[in-house]
C-alpha cells in the first residue's frame, strides 16, 4: 500500500525531539509501560507534537495501579491517562472514546480503552 501521507517515527517518546507538529498524535499501549515519574514529559510531547488531535489507546484504571507484567514488576501501569492529560492541558476536549474488546470476532485485540482529544 502507498502510505505517502503517513509518517511513522520509530523512536522513544522519552527521547524524540523535533520542531514539527502534526494533525494527529497517536499513542497505543505505550503509556502503560512508561515509568509514572516520566509521564509528564510524555504528555508534554504528545501535546507539543499535535496541532489538533491526540488519540490515546491504553489499558484504563480510574486510579493508578501497577500490574504484574509477565512476571515482572515496575513494567506495566494502568491509570486514567486521558483524564490526566486533560487536567494538564485544559484546552483539550474529549470528543470521542470507546472500548476495544478482546473477543471481537472481526478485530480482536486486548481490552483497551481509546480516547480522542481535540485542542480548542
Which positions does each model-derived feature cover?
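Class I (Rossmann-like) S-adenosyl-L-methionine-dependent methyltransferase catalytic domain
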Residues: 1-20, 34-120
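Polar, enzyme-active/binding microenvironments
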Residues: 23
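A conserved beta-strand element that flanks and buttresses the S-adenosyl-L-methionine
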Residues: 26
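ABC ATPase nucleotide-binding domain "signature" loop
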Residues: 29, 33
Amino acid at each position: 500500500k502507498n502510505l505517502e501521507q503517513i509518517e511513522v517515527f520509530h523512536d522513544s517518546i522519552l527521547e524524540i525531539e523535533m520542531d514539527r507538529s502534526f494533525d494527529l498524535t497517536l499513542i497505543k499501549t505505550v503509556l502503560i509501560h512508561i515509568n509514572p515519574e516520566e509521564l509528564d514529559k510524555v504528555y508534554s510531547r504528545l501535546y507539543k507534537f499535535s496541532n489538533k488531535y491526540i488519540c490515546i489507546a491504553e489499558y484504563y484504571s480510574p486510579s493508578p495501579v501497577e500490574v504484574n507484567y509477565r512476571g515482572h514488576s515496575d513494567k506495566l501501569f494502568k491509570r486514567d491517562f486521558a483524564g490526566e492529560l486533560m487536567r494538564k492541558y485544559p484546552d483539550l476536549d474529549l470528543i470521542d472514546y470507546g472500548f476495544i474488546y478482546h473477543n471481537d470476532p472481526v478485530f480482536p485485540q486486548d481490552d483497551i480503552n481509546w480516547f480522542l482529544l481535540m485542542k480548542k
